[in-house]
Amino acid sequence: MSLGSGFRENISHQDLVSNRRNVYNVIYETNYRTWRKSYMDLTKLSAYEIIEHRDLPDLKSEGALLKHKKSGARVLLISNDDENKVFNIGFRTPTTNSTGVPHIMEHTVLCGSEKFPTKDPFVELVKGSLNTFLNAMTYPDKTVYPVASCNEKDFQNLMDVYMDAVLHPNIYKHEEIFRQEGWNYHLEEADGELSYNGVVYNEMKGAFSSPDGVLDRMILNSLFPDTTYANESGGDPDVIPELTYEEYLNFHRTYYHPSNSYIYLYGNMDMEEKLNWLDQEYLSAYDKKEVDSEIHLQKPFEKMHDITKPYSIASNESTEDNTYLSYNKVIGTSLDEKLYLAFQILDYALLSAPGAPITKALLEAGIGKDISGSYDSSTYQPIFSIVAKNANEEQKAEFVKVIEDTLKGIVENGMDKKALEAGINYHEFRYREA
């Protein structure tokens, strides 16, 4: 076939460039698929059900979603030529109180396991592993354990340590792990005052003393009073000591099961080998079970709520120009991809771009000295927030009016096209670099 045979003199230069780009894309995709098909053949994996399997051309990757037949574990694969291999296992961990049990669990499962009984394998990995990333994080509704490494042997060891940690931790054998990481009674001297201590307890005391941290928690808790988000998954220092050892163990028994897990593998690796290893070493030992970890939706409020919460300042600080004002809205659900992308762009265009209309309007009105916005999609129902720092409490009504008047004006007159294009370009670059 001649590439030039279909062109005529009335085709524009732009059309020509577009067609040339399409030809290049076909050549690239053909080569890519040849490599992919010879690299990730999932048809021989009898232990797994293939739910979806497709190309991800924007990521130059191949993706697959599987379910382990016996245990019910879900597995997401992203196969490509990136040598920085990534593994993550996560569990949905809703909580009904603010004792911080998800956070304490995250700390304690990494304090020794059946295969790796050392007191603190996490510290040993930090010192001796070739990892490019090593962590564990507690969110308001989930707990995740991600690792990454460019070295195959090191990566395999990291997977083994983390899988054994979350499924076979030493917490059932040694109550002192819970006491050390969660909370315990502390007595400095025989005649001294009894106090609370513990790694998570002390960590959250620090977190609760931060004005920004107080505001973030207040936004989340107040917008979702009837859901798990009304509770502090990290733990409220005043409530943490209410957690008992047996309640803590029951939390692990309930939620740290493969049926409630999501496993993620990314990068250039033998995916079939990794999946077989997961099946034989861990998942095949578990039978599927029902785990009630559903994250419920918050019903809409009938009217806007107005909440005030004090925070501590230094004795030599003035209360003038020291108030945070925050305007917050719940926006759909995190499963709506188009809405998610739209608000990422709007957040930039409305509040971060040069001459951003809401930021400009608030500063011109003298409300706050630092205006910021955020679109937090880490929860089931994302939150769009506008925050004015270094403001005053008596400016609250004007703060709301300026924001809503500005938004009404944008609805009536439209947005600056260049600001929207800048937002699109900014996020497109971020996604391609990620």
Give residue ranges: language-model regions:
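Short, positively charged and aromatic/hydrophobic N-terminal segments
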Residues: 9, 18-36
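Charge-rich, well-structured scaffold segments of protease-associated domains
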Residues: 35-47, 94, 108, 112-302, ...
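N- or domain-start disorder-to-order transition segments that initiate the globular core
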Residues: 40-82
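Active-site recognition of the HExxH zinc-binding catalytic motif
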Residues: 99-111
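Position-driven detector of the extreme protein N-terminus
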Residues: 2, 17, 270-272
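Short pre-active-site segment immediately N-terminal to the catalytic Zn-binding motif
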Residues: 91-99
